[in-house]
Curated annotation (Swiss-Prot):
Protein name: Phosphonates import ATP-binding protein PhnC 2
Pfam families found in the cross-reference section: ABC_tran (PF00005)
Originating gene: phnC2
Organism: Rhodopseudomonas palustris (strain BisA53)
SUPFAM superfamilies linked to this entry: P-loop containing nucleoside triphosphate hydrolases
Localisation: Cell inner membrane
Disulfide bonds: none
Entry keyword Cell membrane: yes
């Protein structure tokens, strides 16, 4: 189980994440929602330890993740694989090599520098690409792919890390509707077929409701909603997103004079 206890991250006097607490059982597909600047990305980066918490701690199966250093920290980052909005592929390298980068924590650095990847890792990478219909592109340069194809390669790279958790930070933010569905279906496959916990930052409420079995809503760095998608009423969503409600819900949902975020405090699950 992943447990977040009183997690806070401050930049100067501003708290990007403010006393966030929740627990996630293995195998869930959790959507983290909220307006821009709510603290969603910082939360995921702290779970992966790409950002350091100012206060609080993260536990995974009773291990204190916030105390990890050195090799133990590198192993945790492999077990909690990140997928980024920007794909983070190396454009000049072929697709297969980009996926193999997900095995860096498992091999000596001289092997990766010389690109002497073990055959079992190559087979694992090809299998991961095949899961997302990208095996035919294995020899192609990454910068020759479309955005949706690049994100599928990034998901395959995360899969070869053989993670316990996948942390997807706005993975479809720059994609068109067709590629958005393809990428979200790929994340759902990771979750349902492989049983990997997925925590995904999403701006679209429709996608969050359609794909996630639990939603965590953030506002001004705080967790202000935690529950099943069906518990997130349109009224709560309007309060959560405030001025961005039209964008994330569609014009047909807009009701003038929607309430402000502080009223959401009672929506957090006990």
């Amino acid at each position: 189980m992943l447990v977040v206890e009183g997690l806070t991250c401050r930049f100067g006097t501003k708290a990007a994440v403010d006393n966030a607490s929740f627990s996630i059982t293995p195998g869930g597909f959790v959507g983290v929602i909220g307006r821009s600047g709510a603290g969603k990305s910082t939360l995921l980066r702290m779970i992966n330890r790409l950002a350091e918490p100012s206060e609080g701690r993260i536990l995974f199966h009773d291990q204190d993740v916030t105390a990890l250093q050195g090799q133990a920290l590198r192993q945790w980052r492999a077990r909690s694989a990140m997928i980024f909005q920007q794909f983070n592929l190396i454009g000049r390298l072929d697709v297969l090599t980009n996926v193999l980068m997900g095995r860096l924590a498992e091999i000596p650095s001289w092997r990766s520098l010389a690109q002497l990847w073990p055959e079992k890792d190559k087979a694992l990478a090809m299998s991961a690409l095949d899961q997302f219909d990208m095996a035919a592109y294995a020899a192609q340069r990454a910068d020759q792919l479309s955005g949706g194809q690049q994100q599928r390669v990034a998901i395959a790279r995360a899969l070869v890390q053989q993670p316990d958790i996948v942390l997807a930070d706005e993975p479809i933010a720059s994609l068109d509707p067709r590629n958005t569905k393809i990428v979200m279906d790929a994340l759902l496959r990771i979750n349902k077929h492989f049983g990997i916990t997925v925590i995904c930052n999403l701006h679209s409420l429709d996608l969050a409701r359609n794909y996630c079995d639990r939603l965590i809503g953030m506002a001004s760095g705080r967790v202000v909603f935690d529950g099943a998608p069906e518990q997130l009423t349109d009224q709560i969503a309007r309060e959560l997103y405030d001025l961005e409600a039209n964008e994330v819900m569609g014009a047909e949902h807009h009701v003038p004079g929607a309430s402000s975020v502080p009223e959401l405090a009672g929506a957090v699950a006990a």
